[in-house]
């Protein structure tokens, strides 16, 4: 009787961006620590990340992150972004922590508590089927952030909605 060859799945790591200070919320707490139904926003994102069963979860936090680190100790590794220079810079802060990791890396925002595991699993599946080097999960909004692409279609930069102009 024949056997079926199953290709091993690549290792998976999740980077969670949790550097927001909550200034637009008029709060001194880290944005990801604001509660929804009695739990910090970051708790929901971590639960979704954990359901992907990654080998590593690395959370990028801001300079005043003691509350976040104490609350989530043991569930994630932390790296700090001391100077906030945008989304791309925040992602780069995880590079050293993942320098010996050779699998797929998925980046999530820590302030997206409504993200569900099924959506992420679908994205991971589509990425693996397509063989894409970069996969973005996006949604249609009235005031979206923007992706600026070069002539070949590669992402050059992320423009936050607050910085976007009509250009």
What are these regions (language model features)?
Residues 2-13, 39-110, 114-118, 122-125:
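Conserved N-terminal catalytic core of the sugar/cofactor nucleotidyltransferase
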Residues 36, 79, 158:
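Hydrophobic residues at beta-strand termini and immediately following loops
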Residues 9-12, 30, 102, 131, ...:
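A structure-centric signal for secondary-structure junctions around beta-strands
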Residues 66, 115-167:
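Conserved core of the sugar-phosphate nucleotidyltransferase
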Residues 10-36, 71-72:
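Glycine-rich N-terminal loop/short-helix segment of MobA-like nucleotidyltransferase
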Residues 18, 61, 109, 136-139:
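Short beta-strand/turn micro-motifs composed of small residues
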């Amino acid at each position: 009787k024949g056997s079926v060859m199953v290709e091993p799945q690549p290792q998976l790591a999740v980077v969670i961006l949790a550097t927001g200070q909550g200034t637009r919320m008029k709060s001194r707490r880290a944005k990801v620590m604001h509660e929804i139904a009695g739990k910090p926003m970051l708790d929901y994102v971590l639960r979704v990340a954990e359901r992907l069963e990654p080998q590593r979860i690395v959370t990028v936090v801001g300079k005043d992150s003691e509350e976040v680190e104490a609350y989530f100790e043991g569930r994630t590794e932390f790296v700090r972004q001391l100077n906030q220079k945008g989304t791309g810079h925040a992602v780069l802060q995880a590079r050293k922590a993942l320098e010996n990791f050779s699998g797929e890396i998925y980046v999530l925002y820590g302030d997206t508590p409504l993200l569900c595991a099924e959506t992420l699993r679908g994205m991971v599946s589509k990425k693996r089927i397509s063989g894409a080097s970069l996969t973005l999960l996006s949604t249609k909004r009235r005031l979206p952030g923007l992706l600026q692409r070069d002539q070949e279609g590669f992402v050059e930069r992320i423009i936050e909605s607050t910085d976007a102009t009509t250009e």
